[in-house]
């Protein structure tokens, strides 16, 4: 497994900081995963423990993994845009990863995120995306989530005691979503302290089961 820094360029001309962790040479490449971090106005960046655990784990399961800082975070250019411009940031990450995967083998590109990053990722619906992985998404009943009616697969990981969107509230929001799996992390709240490695394993297992199934 190798790790490199990278620069993403958004369609509106911003340069974003990123890291890429590639699949070890002795592991078959399955595809790639984008990881979007929690809310930048509350200290979120690409080094958050949940994001970092996924960044370390997923390459061992066959997925090149990219984490990045949203616009206005650390050395990424621009300023926070309340989720709108940040969708362009995720799209730039998908564009970057498309050069790492083999389209002829139908390698997959998944959009993943935690908290704010999950909510942003769920509204990036471009054709190159294979599906979505949303960890503790802070969804509300009036949220307009672009992927909700999309037939591509979705994994929603929700902490049992999430302060913003607990399992029962999530069910009321996503009850009519297509092709959606839900996984509850017992004894965890929104911040998932002590549960980051468990979350990473759940994501890796879900992706592996999709391939084997």
Model-derived features: positions:
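Short beta-strand/loop motif that positions the catalytic acidic residue
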Residues: 150-151, 156-158, 162
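Primarily recognizes the serine-hydrolase "nucleophile elbow" in alpha/beta-hydrolase
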Residues: 88-152
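Acidic catalytic loop of the alpha/beta-hydrolase fold
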Residues: 160-165, 190-191
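Catalytic histidine neighborhood in serine/cysteine hydrolases
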Residues: 176-191
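Serine-hydrolase catalytic machinery in alpha/beta-hydrolase-like enzymes
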Residues: 15-104
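A domain-start/cap signature at the N-terminus of enzymes
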Residues: 1-9
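Catalytic histidine-centered segment of alpha/beta-hydrolase-like enzymes
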Residues: 188-200
